[in-house]
A protein has these predicted regions:
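Short coil-to-helix segment of the ABC ATPase nucleotide-binding domain corresponding to the Q-loop/switch region
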Residues: 99-107
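Conserved signature/switch motifs of ABC ATPase nucleotide-binding domains
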Residues: 138, 159, 191
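Conserved ABC ATPase "signature" region
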Residues: 117-135
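Conserved ABC ATPase signature
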Residues: 139-143, 147
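ABC ATPase NBD coupling module
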Residues: 73-87, 116
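Helix-to-loop junction immediately C-terminal to a conserved catalytic motif
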Residues: 59
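ABC ATPase C-loop
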Residues: 132, 156-157
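Catalytic Walker B motif of ABC-type/P-loop ATPase nucleotide-binding domains
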Residues: 164-167
């Protein structure tokens, strides 16, 4: 069992006893954690420990073998999204290669109910925040891997989420871009916002308020 002690008050995100098995192999066993407004949670652990699987479950993109996920006290029964104040930055980024960086963000914002003019302005503002203002009109297929990663982060930021779930959101970035992007991500966890990010980087984890380490404890029978 892996658990972090719960704080008092309503959690933005709560996982209760999550277990996950894939192809007969147990990936996660009884993981419990809660994240409150203003908190930054790092999910750490060695390769294959289940970091990506956990974030996928927290986002509602897969179904746990057992256990439940709650957002603002309401049980999650589908994919989490802007309707629940949630934004995702997952591996693969989910960008449309034949649209520009700005258009990818505009599509997401308009799907979330923003007016076209507001979406266009917000897209460019978000790209500027991660240092991609000059690339707003570049097709995604013309961008480097790091630029695509920052575009995905900008899209999530533009949604103004109360909960941002990010899987290795700076893995492809050079030191300067990494610093800028982390600053913007951590700004989500101010006021009522919360951030959950998986990372293999101990420096990133150390900047978070709490760490959920998926490395099994010695003698843990799973």
């Amino acid at each position: 069992m892996i658990a972090l002690e719960a704080r008092a008050g309503m959690a933005t995100l709560e996982a209760r006893g999550l277990a996950y098995t894939r192809d007969g192999q147990q990936i996660l066993s009884r993981v419990s954690v809660s994240v409150h407004p203003g908190e930054r949670l790092a999910v750490t652990g060695p390769s294959g420990s289940g970091k990506t699987s956990l974030l996928t479950l927290l986002a509602g993109l897969d179904t746990p073998s057992s256990g439940e996920v709650y957002i603002d006290g309401i049980r999650l029964t589908g994919v989490a999204g802007p309707g629940q104040g949630v934004a995702l930055v997952l591996q693969g980024y989910g960008l449309v290669s034949l649209l520009t960086a700005a258009e990818n963000i505009e599509v997401a914002l308009r799907a979330a109910g923003r007016a076209p003019s507001e979406a266009a302005a917000a897209a460019r503002e978000a790209l500027g925040q991660v240092g991609l203002g000059a690339h707003a009109d570049h097709l995604v297929e013309e961008l480097s891997g790091g630029q695509q990663q920052r575009t995905a982060v900008a899209r999530a930021l533009a949604l103004r989420p109360r909960l941002l779930i990010a899987d290795e959101p700076t893995a492809e970035l050079d030191p300067a871009s990494r610093a800028i992007t982390l600053t913007r991500l951590f700004e989500v966890a101010t006021g009522d916002g919360a951030l959950v990010l998986a990372t293999h980087d101990p420096e990133v984890a150390a900047r978070c308020d709490r760490i959920l380490d998926l490395r099994p404890a010695a003698g843990d029978d799973g």
